[in-house]
Every structure is written in C-alpha cells, then in structure tokens.
Amino acid sequence: FYSFLELEHLYDSAIELVKTQLNIFDNEFSMRFQRNPIHNIESRIKTPQSIVGKLQRKGMPVTPESARNNLTDIAGVRVICCYIDDIYAIADLLTDHSAFQLRKIKDYIKNPKPNGYRSFHMILDVPVYMSNGKEIAPVEIQIRTIAMDFWASLEHQLHYKSTGDPKIAASLTGELKECSETISGIDQKMQDMFKKINLL
C-alpha cells in the first residue's frame, strides 16, 4: 500500500502541521506577552536508508508498512526555547491540543541521562488529512533550551571524534557531565532573572 515516497510525504505533512501549530503558539505569546518563547524550530525526516537500517537492526520486515507500524522516530521536530518554563508551557499546549494525541513523554530535564543529556521528549500522533482520508503519523518532538541544545550539539561532535581513543573518551565523559551541570545552573539563573524582571 505504501511506498517510501508516500511515507515521506505523510511524515513531512505531519511535521508541517506541528510546526504550524508551534508558530501559532509563538505568535500568540508575542501578541499577548510581548515575547517569543520559541527561539528556533528544526525538523528532519529519516532517510529511506536510515529507516531500512533501523528495521534490520530490530529484525523487522523491511517494508514501508513495517516502518509505519513499528517506528515512531521517522519524523522529528526540535523546539529550542529561551527558558526552562517555556519548555513545559509548549509541551502542555501541544498535549492539550485537541487534534494531537499524546503517545509518550520522557523528561530528561528532571531526570537527565547518565551522560548529562537534558531535553524534554514527547511523541504525538498527528492526524493528516489526505485526499483518500485521514492518516495518523507519529512525530517525535524534542524541546530544550538554547543552553541544552548547545551542550547536546557539542557533546555529539566530541563523542564522535573521541571514539578512536578509549582513554580520551572516558575523560571527556566526566568533563561533559560537569559541563552539563554548569549549563543547567546557568539555565536556572537565567530563568530566575527573567522571573525577577517580570515582577517589576
């Protein structure tokens, strides 16, 4: 029934719907509160090669239907927010949206990964209305602050470059976790300063 091209169109459409709704929220905040909680929105769709590789690793049939039924991270949206409170505000708005169905939440801000990674993850089932009817596509959404995104981007680069030397990799692991703690503290300070300014 599905080709990989049709699959890509479905998930691309779901991403556009989520991004449109995020921009509506952001513009409303700008109008009502004179500020934008969202700094940036990024998105991506897994390539057919990446989808095939993941299905093979999971020992599942390598077909578009199998990908549709078994993978929830084909479509991804990353929302970069200004403050920690903005993350939860955006997550709540998406969760409460009547068109979207919440499938899963993982809060790596309150419960960081062992390596120091912090972000708020959620999977939403997004309805896409095609010419032949409604289709549901899961979209993985990562919401994080500018500081969290800075750490995650550099951690990925450093980890990738250090894999050839186990000693350097082990040393970097500890240092990166320390950096994560420092950045988390800065995030909280910025949040506190923002709250003080709002009380003026």
Functional labels for PLM-detected ranges:
Residues F1-L71, S184, F194-L199:
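Charge-rich, low-complexity segments
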Residues D73-V77:
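Short amphipathic alpha-helical segments
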